[in-house]
Amino acid sequence: MAMFPPVEDSVLQNNPDFVNLYNKLTNVVLNSDCSTQNGPRAKERASVRQELDRRRLISAKQHLLTCAISSATPSSTPPATRASSRLQPPKGHQAGGSNSQQQQPSLPEPLLDLLIVLPPLLDANNPPLPQDTLQLLFAHPPLSELETLLPALAPIIASNLRTWALGLARIAHPSTNASFLHRHIASLPTTLSGWRSDLAAAETELSSHRLRSLAALTSLLQAATNALSLLIRALEVKHGKVARSLELRAAEASLHARRYDADAVIAAASVRRAFYTPEAITALRNYGAHLRDAKMRSEERVRGLAAELGEYGVGVDGGENKEKKMREMSRVYREMTRQMDDTRRDLDRLNQG
């Protein structure tokens, strides 16, 4: 169920107009679940809520009865029967277990069969049976005799319900004597309703306490901030002159560093202008252009020589034989040239002689 959100106390204290609006909303206009109190559909919602509560009550009763019947076993007996069995005196130790079995009242066989058949049918975890199977079961005993066996089944169901109610009463009143717990069964709904109301009130109060804690924490943080501010101011008052002196010295050193940097840049520019005169710059540019032109001519010469070598089979795929032949011709040419030079020198010596 939704609840109206609480507001911090600091917000209410700093906004008096909002306080009036908030009080009017929470007390006059809206309910605790944020629904309108006097809206045009309030009566309709109230009737729907009443119908919902009625259906919830019916569903709860059906659920309790289903659980009581599902948990009923052949050994379950109503409280009156168990009390009468406790009043019977023992027959003797020599009878043993047979006498105790005779003392316990035996249930009719149809009722025993019904207690065996009903729990699996009412168990929600089991898959539902086909309609034909259900019709067949209800057409034969013991389900066909259900109306006849209901008066005998009712005390067993009542015993289960009373056992559960006693367990709840024991939880609700742990300090009460076990023999007096049955007196609190009738007041269990009132007790549970009171617990729910107390729980809702405790949750609301917890939210309020959380908001108060947050407001207190905010105030504490604000106080700590103010304390730190005062401490910083005190330190500034005590050490302010030294800090300002150091700050001024640092600023002066920074200005000197900037000036030295600017002087270095100016000096570098002056040296550059003194070393590289306009004539030198022009000469360097011309020399660079000459180098680029020489590079282009060298590249063209290399390409021409490569083309000539390609004609002689050098550096061309499949021209190995041609390259060998040209190398051999070159060798023969060099040898013939050497022989001709030797012959020319011999002739020159003969002519001189």
Curated annotation (Swiss-Prot):
Top-level division of the source organism's lineage: Eukaryota
Listed Low complexity bias regions: 70-86
Keywords per UniProt: Coiled coil
Coiled-coil region: 319-353
Keyword Coiled coil applies: yes
Annotated region described as Disordered, given as residue ranges: 69-106
Protein name from the UniProt record: Uncharacterized protein FGSG_10745
Species in which this protein is naturally found: Gibberella zeae (strain ATCC MYA-4620 / CBS 123657 / FGSC 9075 / NRRL 31084 / PH-1)
Lineage: Eukaryota, Fungi, Dikarya, Ascomycota, Pezizomycotina
